[in-house]
């Protein structure tokens, strides 16, 4: 065993950081985690990410490293690549991107020139910053054109998207979102892209685990390139991947990630990705994905029963997006009240929201994390009612408010204790 300069446990050498980690463990165990972009990884994933690979610098790709001593780094990265390709049925993959944003930027660097036109879903309609939003590099370096959802239904209007693409003739068309709960017609997106000779990028960061399990439409038959994070419904470490069935595109992406965007890969994270991909290949992962959707649909049912407005009127995924305007409540007020009582979600803009980004008119919920913890329909029905109790209580008298809050705190404690991680 390597002898370290300071061969001590974290608790012995840095009590401040140890206390932060202990506190975060307690927070995750004692609160309901309903943020759509979060999940609970397995102990095996944590072990891999905290492994000795933390020490290894492995600049380059398997078999083509700029450093010696990369034998096992090569093996584990190849395992990750092989498992990922098997999981999604694709031919080529890069498992080195540190984040979803860097994965998307890697695609832009590989396929675009500064000033090229990119068409993606607008941020206020559920798109992601990296899909051409003004504050992002994607909105600064490229001519970003944004499509929107239908004002009445909240759904993607493919005919309007086609008109926009035909008008602006982009080099890249992006399909994907960060707050769109419904299925995406990747086939139609490819047909539209082909009409102007555009590349189609499918950003499946939110849906990857559901796609891997066959519970959400797959883009791989249609998209030129696919990006995803690894830490949402895929239930892996924080990181990202890029996949394609086109060898010429794969070669360009290899160069754009290294040496273009990144230097040394995070081998401990890649090891954890390999573990997570292996877990997702097991039969019980399909059961997990099915339960995710069942649980989110129960939330929709309860929210509707209690008078909340659901954007798109339902969900086909882990995401539930709620419009709070009929309740006269902002997302900011609701999310702070929920957090105080142990229910963690995020404030979120709804389509065509007029509130500021730090206020918003909506809430976004996700069912993936608590489904990992073992909660099913009956527990999610209880969660849905607790959420509605808190929202309805925001304008109640102080006496009523205190009573409701104590009841919710008690129920959250009982529920989290019964399913403690």
Curated annotation (Swiss-Prot):
Name of the molecule in the record: Serine hydroxymethyltransferase
HAMAP family the UniProt entry points to: SHMT
InterPro entries from the UniProt entry: PyrdxlP-dep_Trfase, PyrdxlP-dep_Trfase_major, PyrdxlP-dep_Trfase_small, Ser_HO-MeTrfase, Ser_HO-MeTrfase-like, Ser_HO-MeTrfase_PLP_BS, SHMT-like_dom
Gene for this chain: glyA
Family to which the UniProt record says this protein belongs: Belongs to the SHMT family.
Pfam families cross-referenced by the UniProt entry: SHMT
The UniProt record lists the keyword Cytoplasm: yes
Pathway given in the UniProt record: One-carbon metabolism; tetrahydrofolate interconversion; Amino-acid biosynthesis; glycine biosynthesis; glycine from L-serine: step 1/1
Job of this protein: Catalyzes the reversible interconversion of serine and glycine with tetrahydrofolate (THF) serving as the one-carbon carrier. This reaction serves as the major source of one-carbon groups required for the biosynthesis of purines, thymidylate, methionine, and other important biomolecules. Also exhibits THF-independent aldolase activity toward beta-hydroxyamino acids, producing glycine and aldehydes, via a retro-aldol mechanism.
Cofactor: pyridoxal 5'-phosphate
Residues that bind (6S)-5,6,7,8-tetrahydrofolate: 123, 127-129
A molecular function (GO) term: glycine hydroxymethyltransferase activity
Chief location bin: cytoplasm
SUPFAM superfamilies on file: PLP-dependent transferases
Gene Ontology biological process: glycine biosynthetic process from serine; tetrahydrofolate interconversion
Keyword Cytoplasm on entry: yes
EC class name: transferase
Catalytic reaction list: (6R)-5,10-methylene-5,6,7,8-tetrahydrofolate + glycine + H2O = (6S)-5,6,7,8-tetrahydrofolate + L-serine
Gene3D superfamilies given in the database record: Aspartate Aminotransferase, domain 1, Type I PLP-dependent aspartate aminotransferase-like (Major domain)
Site (Plays an important role in substrate specificity) location in chain: 231
UniProt cross-references to NCBIfam families, sorted A to Z: PRK00011.1
Compartmental location: Cytoplasm
